[in-house]
Structures are given as structure tokens and as C-alpha cells.
């Protein structure tokens, strides 16, 4: 019996020891996890600081060489736009590939730039949502007539009219403005070439021995046309509006409230409208300041419905479609000229004034620091010798 009791006591002690060792191991592991997490967070903070310092350094260097960079950008922009116009006439079937290349290269670069400027919520706007759908259509479903009509409605509806209404400016010395114009202008040109000018599309869509069509897709059924050019695009737009509201006004609400420098489309529009005290600002305040955002959503919905309805006659008429392309390009060029002749001179004057105000304290300190020392007078020399 005594041996059994000793054995049970030993087993209890061993069980307690094993429990303590397991407990200690768990504590050690939790400590290691906490230490690793702290180390990774410190490394992330250090990496972020290094990247921000590098970004500031690059921005300062860009400011120092601003004129040269603007000249290079203007040269490349003019040559690129001229090459695009040549390609549009010589090989219209290659325009969709040019658009895909542009989107894949410049939209990620814009996200990096906008992230640094705290403008990255602009990339949740409808134009980027629609351009992503365009990319899916062109790369994955190029022969899907229904998806083509939805994309056509977006490209020649809200995106095209935003180019005119929001006064996008074709300024070749500004990469940001060029990209903004092309995001709204290129999709319409892409779907124009596919519908009216693309010989490869026509050859693929016409069986041998049948009469050639004048356009693709050929739609004779008016209800079908109304459904895929207006109703379905409106449903897709509503889906975007719901997602945008959930992300910006629900999920990221506290983040935006903490940092007023982070810009969204609503913040930019409200600031500009309030500063100008225009009709948009007055109409948005009909239901009170607390409901301005809902009024902006309503205005955008009305704008979208109206512009999508206009895509139906544009889709059916080649001449009307050509006139609309000329109107869009003319508006972008006109706004660019207005920017160069009216806005840019004011910006240059403001920059010069800012430089002068920054240089004034330095110039005031220079005479005091480098003032020439006069030789001591006879009285001063005697006083120094006496002491």
C-alpha cells in the first residue's frame, strides 16, 4: 500500500511538473509572438518612415527641376498623342491594346502617387470601377455583345460627359491631367473603333456567304437595346454606389474623420462648391447641411441616368457618334488652353510670391551674420590696452 501511495504521489508530482512546463512553454511562445509582432511593427514603421523620406526627397528634387520636367512631359505628351492619332487612323483594331497597356501601367502608378498625396480614395470613383469592367471585357470577353453594350453605355455616358461637365483639361505638361483626360476619353474611342472601324471584328462576326453588317453588334430589337444600354448598366451603377457608400461612409468613416487631409470626391466637390457658393452648393443644402452627401448622391444618380439615356441614339447613329467624339476632344483641348492661359500664370505668380516670402527671413539674417567688422577706434584701442 505504501508503495502504491508513493507511486501515486510521484505521478501527481510528475503531472504537476508537466503541466507547469507546458504552461511555461505557452508563456514563452506568447512572449516570442509578442516580441516578433513588436519587431515587425517597428520594422514596418521604420520602412514607412524611410519611404516617406524618400518620397519627400524625390518631391523636392522634382520641384528643383520642375521646368525641365514640364518640358520633357510636354514633349512626350505631344508625341504620344500624335502617335495615338496616327494609330487611330492607320490601325484602329490596335486601339483596345493601347488602352489596356495604358490602364495597366498608369493606374497603378497613379495609385502610388495618390497614396502619397492622400488622394487614393479617388480611385474608388465610378470612372475607375467602369474602366476595370472595360479591361475585363476587352481581355476576357471581347466577343460578348451584351457586356460590350454595358461598357458602351458607361464609356459614352457618365465617363464621356464627366469629361465635359467637370472640365477635364488636356495639358501636355502635366502627367496627372493627361491621365485624367485619357481615363475618360480613351474608353469611348475604344468602343467607337470596335463598333464602327474594326475590320477584324467584322470579319469574325460575319459568317462566310452572308452580307456584311455596317456595325458590331447589330441590334434591331428596341427593347433589347434599351435593356442592355440603359437598365442593366443602371443596375451595375447602383451596385457601385452601394459599395462606395459602404467603404467610404461606413468602413472608413473614422479614418476619414481623423484625417481631414485625406480627400474624397465628395470632400473636393463640397469644398469647391462652398468656396464658389455656386448653385450646386445652394441646391445641396436644401435639406440642411447634414444631408448634403445624400443630395450629392442624388445629383450623381440623375446625371448618370440622363447620360446613359443619351447613349441609345449615339449607339444607333454613326454620324452622331463621330460628332460626339469631336465634341469630347474639343472640350478637353479647350479646357487645356484655358488652364494654360488663365490658371497656370496665376500659379506661377503664387509660387514666385511664396519663394520671396520664404527667402526674406534668410536675406534679413545674412547682413547680421556677415556684417564686416570695423577696426577699433583710438579710444577703443586705449581702453583695451588699459584693461
UniProtKB/Swiss-Prot annotation:
Where does it mainly reside? membrane
Which cellular compartments is it found in?
Answer: Membrane
Lineage: superkingdom? Eukaryota
- What membrane topology is given? Multi-pass membrane protein
Database matches in InterPro entries: GPCAT (IPR021261)
List where the protein spans the membrane. Answer: 68-88, 94-114, 121-141, 146-166, 174-194, 228-248, 296-316, 320-340
Name its GO BP terms in alphabetical order. Answer: phosphatidylcholine biosynthetic process
Residue numbers spanned by region Disordered: 352-387
Which terms are listed as keywords in the entry? Acyltransferase, Lipid biosynthesis, Lipid metabolism, Membrane, Phospholipid biosynthesis, Phospholipid metabolism, Transferase, Transmembrane, Transmembrane helix
Class of the enzyme per the UniProt entry, highest EC level: transferase
Give the reaction(s) catalysed: sn-glycerol 3-phosphocholine + an acyl-CoA = a 1-acyl-sn-glycero-3-phosphocholine + CoA; sn-glycero-3-phosphoethanolamine + an acyl-CoA = a monoacyl-sn-glycero-3-phosphoethanolamine + CoA
Query: Which stretches are Lumenal in the membrane topology?
Result: 89-93, 142-145, 195-227, 317-319
Q: Cytoplasmic topology: which positions?
A: 1-67, 115-120, 167-173, 249-295, 341-387
Gene Ontology MF terms: glycero-3-phosphocholine acyltransferase activity
One cellular component term (GO) for this entry is:
membrane
EC number(s): the record gives: 2.3.1.-
Q: Could you list the residue ranges forming a coiled coil in this record?
A: none
> What family is this?
Belongs to the GPC1 family.
Q: Please explain the role this protein plays, according to its UniProt record.
A: Glycerophosphocholine acyltransferase (GPCAT) that utilizes acyl-CoA to acylate glycero-3-phosphocholine (GPC), forming lysophosphatidylcholine (LPC). Shows broad acyl specificities with a preference for 16:0-CoA, polyunsaturated acyl-CoA, and the hydroxylated ricinoleoyl-CoA. Also catalyzes the acylation of glycero-3-phosphoethanolamine (GPE) with acyl-CoA. In addition to acyl-CoA, GPCAT efficiently utilizes LPC and lysophosphatidylethanolamine (LPE) as acyl donors in the acylation of GPC.
What is the name of the protein in this document? Answer: Glycerophosphocholine acyltransferase 1
Question: Could you tell me which species this protein originates from?
Answer: Brassica napus
Amino acid at each position: 500500500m505504501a508503495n502504491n501511495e508513493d507511486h501515486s504521489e510521484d505521478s501527481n508530482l510528475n503531472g504537476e511538473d508537466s503541466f507547469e512546463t507546458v504552461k511555461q512553454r505557452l508563456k514563452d511562445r506568447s512572449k516570442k509572438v509578442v516580441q516578433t509582432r513588436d519587431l515587425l511593427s517597428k520594422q514596418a514603421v521604420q520602412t514607412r518612415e524611410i519611404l516617406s523620406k524618400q518620397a519627400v526627397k524625390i518631391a523636392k528634387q522634382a520641384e528643383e527641376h520642375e521646368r525641365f520636367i514640364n518640358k520633357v512631359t510636354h514633349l512626350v505628351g505631344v508625341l504620344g498623342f500624335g502617335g495615338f492619332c496616327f494609330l487611330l487612323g492607320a490601325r484602329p483594331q490596335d486601339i483596345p491594346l493601347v488602352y489596356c497597356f495604358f490602364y495597366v501601367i498608369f493606374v497603378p502608378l497613379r495609385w502610388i502617387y495618390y497614396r502619397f498625396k492622400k488622394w487614393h480614395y479617388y480611385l474608388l470613383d465610378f470612372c475607375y470601377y467602369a474602366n476595370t469592367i472595360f479591361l475585363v471585357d476587352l481581355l476576357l470577353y471581347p466577343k460578348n455583345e451584351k457586356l460590350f453594350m454595358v461598357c458602351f453605355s458607361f464609356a459614352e455616358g457618365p465617363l464621356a460627359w464627366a469629361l465635359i461637365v467637370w472640365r477635364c483639361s488636356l495639358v501636355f505638361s502635366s502627367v496627372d491631367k493627361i491621365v485624367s483626360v485619357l481615363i475618360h476619353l480613351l474608353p469611348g474611342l475604344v468602343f467607337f473603333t470596335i463598333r464602327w472601324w474594326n475590320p477584324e471584328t467584322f470579319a469574325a462576326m460575319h459568317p462566310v456567304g452572308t452580307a456584311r453588317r455596317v456595325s458590331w453588334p447589330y441590334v434591331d430589337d428596341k427593347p433589347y437595346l434599351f435593356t442592355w444600354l440603359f437598365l442593366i448598366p443602371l443596375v451595375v451603377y447602383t451596385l457601385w454606389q452601394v459599395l462606395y457608400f459602404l467603404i467610404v461612409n461606413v468602413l472608413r468613416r473614422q479614418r476619414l474623420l481623423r484625417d481631414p487631409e485625406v480627400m474624397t470626391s465628395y470632400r473636393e466637390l463640397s469644398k469647391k462648391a462652398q468656396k464658389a457658393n455656386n448653385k450646386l452648393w445652394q441646391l445641396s443644402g436644401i435639406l440642411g447641411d447634414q444631408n448634403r452627401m445624400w443630395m450629392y448622391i442624388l445629383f450623381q444618380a440623375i446625371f448618370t441616368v440622363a447620360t446613359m439615356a443619351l447613349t441609345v441614339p449615339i449607339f444607333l447613329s454613326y454620324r452622331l457618334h463621330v460628332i460626339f467624339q469631336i465634341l469630347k476632344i474639343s472640350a478637353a483641348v479647350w479646357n487645356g488652353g484655358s488652364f494654360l492661359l488663365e490658371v497656370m500664370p496665376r500659379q506661377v505668380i503664387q509660387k514666385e510670391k511664396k519663394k520671396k516670402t520664404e527667402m526674406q527671413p534668410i536675406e534679413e539674417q545674412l547682413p547680421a551674420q556677415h556684417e564686416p567688422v570695423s577696426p577699433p577706434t583710438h579710444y577703443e584701442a586705449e581702453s583695451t590696452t588699459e584693461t
